[in-house]
Structures are given as structure tokens and as C-alpha cells.
Amino acid sequence: MAIHLYKTSTPSTRNGAVDSQVKSNPRNNLIYGQHHCGKGRNARGIITARHRGGGHKRLYRKIDFRRNAKDIYGRIVTIEYDPNRNAYICLIHYGDGEKRYILHPRGAIIGDTIVSGTEVPIKMGNALPLTDMPLGTAIHNIEITLGKGGQLARAAGAVAKLIAKEGKSATLKLPSGEVRLISKNCSATVGQVGNVGVNQKSLGRAGSKCWLGKRPVVRGVVMNPVDHPHGGGEGRAPIGRKKPVTPWGYPALGRRTRKRKKYSETLILRRRSK
């Protein structure tokens, strides 16, 4: 990824750093429009997810998370920008004439070949079941339910590690630090998701954030008491509480928000680290 640094000619471009290499030219048969209504609002128009709204119109790219074209070699033709995720995507031309998008593996270049199946080589971009992978393999786009497609480790730079196999289950260490069990028959893609330097980018101004559909974030301490528990006071006043709270009065730091009776509770060996 090539990071382009702006010259400090105006305040809006000062400290700006964007990716200037990957462009977007999607295929018409692999995109479709989405109807986004509300953008953070519920059916009554009330805000349920803050800091969302506006943004440029998007076309959704059909991504092949299942990788079910077994034993058919494909060639990477393009590496494109996807407005719906922070990872890049690759256009694959398969030997049977089919064309699909997949997540861009780190280090993959135009012209590389990939394949998915049960007895394929352990090579970056290839997809195969966990039972056929050696221990210590770096993987991404991991299935939770067999045949449903990859659901874990899909963000830019995400990578998980296969650390054990016992019985019908495989033990994975996820990017969050969580260690959990998954069926050995589930598939995953070898390697790490590309665009590792996504955190190095700096948009430089609030208007660029608005193009992405992200509205400004206002601190509660500068609000009025009617708007936030931290609000009010004369001048720069403290929050007036022992610990910070959310706009609805719940503890903001340290409180666990995961439901206790989830089906996957028995599959998690170690909860994610902070």
C-alpha cells in the first residue's frame, strides 16, 4: 500500500495521509445497490446508533466468502478498493470462466494463482479445511458454521493462528486475543488480510469522515445536563461522578456487555484481551 502525504498548504490537508495506489472499477455483474434508510435510526426515526448519517452512495460488491469453487484454479486480475470495508478486494478469473471477488491476502499481486479444496498446497490465498492445515498456520476468513462462509478475521490486517487440533475441534487464537474452538471441517484462507497499514492513514479533516458516513463525536462534558450525565457546570467543569457513564447512565468503563447465556460460551477457552 502506497501512503500519499499531503503538503501542508491548507489546514484541511495538514497531516493528511491517504492511499493513492488502489482504485475502484467494479464489474457490473458483481455489484448491486443497497437501500440505506435511516442511517442509525429506527422505524420511528429515533437515533439508535450515534455518529452515523450522510455519506456517499455505495454499491455493494459481492464477495465470495465461501470459496466453494473447489479444485478450480483462479488468477488475480485486479486489486480494487471496496467502500464497504477497510480491506481491499481481488477480482479472480477462474479456469471455468467464472469471475468472483475475494478479500485481498497480504502480499498477493496481480497474476498470482489461487485455489480452494481439500488437498491444496499451503499457500497464501488458498482456502482449505482446518483439518488439512499444519499447526501454526496464519489464516483469515474463517468459517464458524460449515458451508456458511467465512465470518472471522475479515478486517484489514486481521490474522488468526491455528494452535491445536483435538478430536472434532480445532483451537484458534483470534486477532482480538480470544482463544476458541471451531469444527475442524470448517474452511479458512491461508495468510493475512491485506491493507495492513490502514491505521496509518489520516483523513486530515472532518469533511472526509462525513463522506464515509461518520458524523462528529461530541464529548459529554461539553453538553448540557439534559443531554448527557457529564454535562453542565460553569466553564470547564469535571464530570461530577466517581466514574464515567454512558449517555443513558450506565458505567462506561469496565462493565461487561456480553450476554452470559450465548451458545458459544462453552467454545470460548479464553476471553478476548483488552
Curated annotation (Swiss-Prot):
One of its GO terms (biological process) is mitochondrial translation. Coiled coil: none annotated. It is found in: Plastid, Chloroplast. Part of the 50S ribosomal subunit. It comes from the Eukaryota. Residues 1-22, 225-274 are annotated as: Disordered. Its main location: plastid. One of its GO terms (cellular component) is mitochondrial large ribosomal subunit. SMART domains: Ribosomal_L2, Ribosomal_L2_C. PROSITE patterns: RIBOSOMAL_L2. Keywords: Chloroplast, Plastid, Ribonucleoprotein, Ribosomal protein. Disulfide bonds: none annotated. HAMAP family: Ribosomal_uL2_B (MF_01320_B). Belongs to the universal ribosomal protein uL2 family. Pfam families: Ribosomal_L2, Ribosomal_L2_C. PANTHER family: LARGE RIBOSOMAL SUBUNIT PROTEIN UL2M, RIBOSOMAL PROTEIN L2. One of its GO terms (molecular function) is structural constituent of ribosome. This is Large ribosomal subunit protein uL2cz/uL2cy. It comes from Nasturtium officinale.
